Amino acid sequence: MNRLLSRSVQERSDERDGAAAIHLTEKAQSAQLDFTPSMQRRQANYASFVERSRKVDPAGAAGLAANLKLDPIALMKPQLAQVGLRTDNLADAYAAYWIEAWEAVHGVTGQTSREKADAVSRQSANAILATPAIAAATPAQKQELAEAMLVQAMLVAAAREQANGDEAKLAEIGRAVGKGASASGLDLRAMTLTEDGFLPAKRTGAADPAPGAEPRALAVSGEAGSRPGYGFLAAAGGAGLGAAFLMGKAMGRRG
């Protein structure tokens, strides 16, 4: 799906260049991506996320487990509502991750406008509804996918907050997030966020990635008492909790 989202960014630009009316999914259509959250299912999802992450980064998984005990999705709900996003809609959940990840990669701070958040949600909905396996997902599958994206967004936001303005750490986080997104087909460095959603960076005059800017391999975890490593963010974005990874699992079962 990430590759489909990347393609939608180019298509959005082509529509603007052709002076065509920009088609954004209507709320009635995106409502197909709503689900009624089950707290029992959420706890099962949390446990599953921790178990998967343990295979990638045992130390990071322990921290993730501690954070998930606080039910971060419930804590995110009022914050996302400020920009018009919901935790019980798959497109909104993907938009929350997409925006948070893009901001990390580009070093952007401050709250996104409701207009931008709404445009990215609709852009996400267009791509999701064009992916039959995801569009036809059961409520349980929608919840699992959405909550995976919300947990990813939480991980990125928490890492950036803990960096406490340290530019070196923030840059390292951005590289890790970009690496994870790239592994699943989403090139965040090639995009810019506008009131119409994401567009190719070149079309807006935004700076291209610097030559040789390919993210370097990051340590999976930092030394105790030292700065943290952010390889877990790359792993989560690329495979551990990514939508592509989850889709293969979720679409293989019912319920």
List each model region and its residues.
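Surface-exposed polar/charged interaction patches
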Residues: 7, 11, 15, 52-59, ...
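Sequence-level detector for tyrosine residue identity
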Residues: 46, 94-97, 230
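N-terminal Sec/ER secretory leader and immediately downstream segment
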Residues: 1-86, 90, 188
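Extended amphipathic alpha-helical interaction segments
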Residues: 79-158
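Long, charge-rich low-complexity segments
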Residues: 26-47, 134-172
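A cross-kingdom marker for long, charged
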Residues: 157-255
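Proline-rich, low-complexity linker regions of envelope-associated factors in Gram-negative bacteria
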Residues: 7, 95, 222-224
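An acidic intrinsically disordered interaction segment
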Residues: 48-74, 111-124, 194-210
